[in-house]
Structures are given as C-alpha cells and as structure tokens.
C-alpha cells in the first residue's frame, strides 16, 4: 500500500463524525443521509445490496451494522479503458466528427462524457455479435455433421486441431472479459461516498492492482485512483476512486438545479399572470390541466434530493471507469 493510501486511511480514522446536514450548501452528506441514499439505490436497483458481513472490528459505529457498505458483484468489463478514446485521441482521427465527439470538462475538472454510454453499448453489442458468430460456426458444423450422417456420405468428423482452433477463438474472447465487485462506503474525511473496485479475470482469479488500473481512464490513474486495502474486508486489495472532488461536483450540480428551479418559478409566475386574464370557463380548463402536472412540478421544484445522491454519484464516476458496466441509473431520475 502506498504512502498516500496510508495517509488516507489515517485521515479517515482521525476525522470526527459530523451528523449535521449541509447537503444543499456544500454537496456533502451525513452518515444518516448516506444510509437514506443507499436505501433508495437498493430500492431502485436490486443489483446493489447493503453488505451485512463486515467484520466487527472493521465496522463503523456511526452506521447500522447491516448497512456498513453497498455492493454489486460480478459487473462485466468487456474492454480495457485504453480502448475508449478520449476527446484528445479522437481529434484528427475523424475531423468531421471532432466537434460532436468532444468531451466537456466542468469547472471542477471532472469529465462530462457525451458519448461514453454509446461507446459502452456499441462495445457490448460488438462482443455479443462476436459470440453469436462463433455460435453460428458451431451450429454450422453440427448441421453439416448431421446431414453427412443422414445422407450416409461418410463418418467424417472434425479433426482435434480444428476444435483446438475454435477453443482458441473462444479463449481469446473470454480473456478480455473481466468482472468487478464494486463497493461504496462512507468517507468520514470528505463526507461523501467512496468507491472501491475488486477485479477478477475470466477464470475468476483476482486481478493484480496494475491490472485493475487498466480499466481506469488514464486521465484519472494518477489523480483519483489509488491502491488500498478494502476497508470492509480483511486481506483484500482494491483500487479506490478518491472522493476529493465529489462534493465539489455535487455543488456545481446543485447550482444548476437552483437555476432550473428559478426558471421554473418565473415560468409559473408568468402562467399565473396569464390565468388572471382568462374567462371563468377557460380558468376551469386550465386548472384541470395544471392539476394533472402538479406532481411533476413539485418534483422539479425540489431540485436534487439527497436520496438521489448515489444515483448521481454513479453517473459522474462512470467517466473514470468507462468499460465497467455498472451504471444502470440512466432512467432513474
């Protein structure tokens, strides 16, 4: 474990717990809000679960024993992060698409990827197509064998070498597949969630730290990703995503949310002025229409809710690990 990781662990241990809620002003959350956001994530996406097997000597007293961390297991990664070109790499490769493919960087330095989910979907489809092609070859061989047997053309069978060639094709495809267990814990020093990755190869053998780094965007390897012992288990090496920027990013999102809320209020005020000019019958019709959309308006006026924190957290953390397909949260909000 590096010096940076040791200092980070020490800081986590020494930082006092703050139970006050200041999510709206700072983008940070309290332990109670972390549990609330975790409950919402588990409710919306059952692939995430609260971990209840944390050793007692590693448990944090300010969290419930059965809600020490969140975990989702066996999440696939079909390609390494280097296969996902950044905006810098794409420039010049196809000049006509440079403007469309550029990635926006927010004022805190985090990347807002426009195309990242499309790339992941395309890659996943590509892997599926490759698998289908191989299955088609197997079906083709089986069908030919049956036809030859029924037609009594002969007992010709594929040589062992030919089967070996097919095994090599399958092995090559499977060797690219990795699976990750993802853990979300509460960081006392930064008062935000913290993500840990534990990876395995296609045979279920644990990945070395440097191998896990291959699934992390090169822009973040030296900035936000570090090798640490998993804090909720013994003798488990992981790669953590440093949470130093998380609250800052959330503050930016909160700012945008407030701006949207202000625009919504101005729109409602304008609508009220228009209603005052309507006739009685027109007002009745308009009131019925407003009642139908009332729930949606109330939701928008609330802006970003604290129980949505982990949903948003997973969205902007996806730019760090572009190939790991754990962001199932696109339609949650």
Curated annotation (Swiss-Prot):
Residues 81-112, 278-300 are annotated as: Disordered. Residues 84-174 are annotated as: Flexible region. The keyword Protein transport applies. It is found in: Cytoplasm. The keyword RNA-binding does not apply. Pfam families: Autophagy_act_C. Residues 95-108 have a biased composition (Acidic residues). GO terms for molecular function: Atg8-family conjugating enzyme activity; Atg8-family ligase activity. InterPro entries: Atg3/Atg10 (IPR007135). GO terms for cellular component: cytosol; mitochondrion; phagophore; phagophore assembly site. Its main location: cytoplasm. Coiled coil: none annotated. PANTHER family: UBIQUITIN-LIKE-CONJUGATING ENZYME ATG3. E2 conjugating enzyme required for the cytoplasm to vacuole transport (Cvt) and autophagy. Required for selective autophagic degradation of the nucleus (nucleophagy) as well as for mitophagy which contributes to regulate mitochondrial quantity and quality by eliminating the mitochondria to a basal level to fulfill cellular energy requirements and preventing excess ROS production. Responsible for the E2-like covalent binding of phosphatidylethanolamine to the C-terminal Gly of ATG8. Monomer. Interacts with ATG8 through an intermediate thioester bond through the C-terminal Gly of ATG8. Also interacts with the 40 amino acid C-terminal region of the E1-like ATG7 enzyme. Also interacts with the ATG12-ATG5 conjugate. Belongs to the ATG3 family. This is Autophagy-related protein 3. The gene is ATG3.
């Amino acid at each position: 474990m590096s010096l940076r990781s040791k200092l980070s662990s020490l800081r986590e241990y020494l930082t006092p717990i703050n139970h006050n809620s200041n999510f709206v002003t700072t983008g940070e959350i309290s332990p109670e809000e972390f549990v609330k956001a975790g409950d919402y994530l588990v409710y919306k996406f059952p692939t995430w679960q609260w971990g209840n097997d944390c050793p007692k000597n590693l448990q944090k007293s300010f969290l419930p024993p059965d809600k020490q961390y969140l975990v989702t297991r066996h999440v696939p990664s079909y390609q390494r992060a280097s296969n996902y070109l950044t905006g810098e790499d794409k420039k010049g490769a196809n000049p006509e698409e440079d403007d469309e493919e550029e990635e926006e960087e927010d004022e805190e330095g985090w990347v807002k990827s426009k195309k990242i989910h499309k790339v992941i979907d395309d890659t996943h489809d590509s892997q599926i197509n490759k698998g289908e092609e191989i299955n088609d070859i197997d079906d083709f061989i089986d069908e030919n064998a049956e036809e030859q047997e029924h037609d009594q053309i002969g007992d010709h069978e594929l040589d062992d070498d030919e089967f070996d060639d097919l095994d090599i094709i399958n092995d090559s495809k499977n060797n690219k597949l990795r699976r990750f267990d993802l853990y979300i814990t509460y960081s006392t020093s930064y008062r935000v969630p913290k993500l840990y990755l534990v990876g395995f190869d296609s045979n279920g053998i644990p990945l070395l730290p440097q191998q896990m780094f291959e699934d992390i965007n090169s822009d973040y390897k030296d900035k936000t990703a570090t090798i640490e012992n998993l804090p909720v288990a013994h003798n488990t090496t992981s790669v953590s995503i440093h949470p130093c920027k998380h609250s800052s990013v959330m503050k930016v999102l909160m700012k945008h949310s407030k701006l949207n809320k202000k625009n919504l209020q101005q729109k409602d005020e304008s609508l009220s002025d228009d209603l005052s000019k309507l006739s009685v019958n027109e007002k009745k019709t308009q009131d019925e229409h407003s009642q139908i959309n009332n729930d949606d308006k109330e939701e928008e006026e609330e802006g970003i809710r604290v129980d949505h924190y982990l949903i948003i957290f997973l969205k902007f953390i996806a730019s760090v690990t572009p190939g790991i397909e754990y962001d199932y949260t696109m339609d949650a909000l």
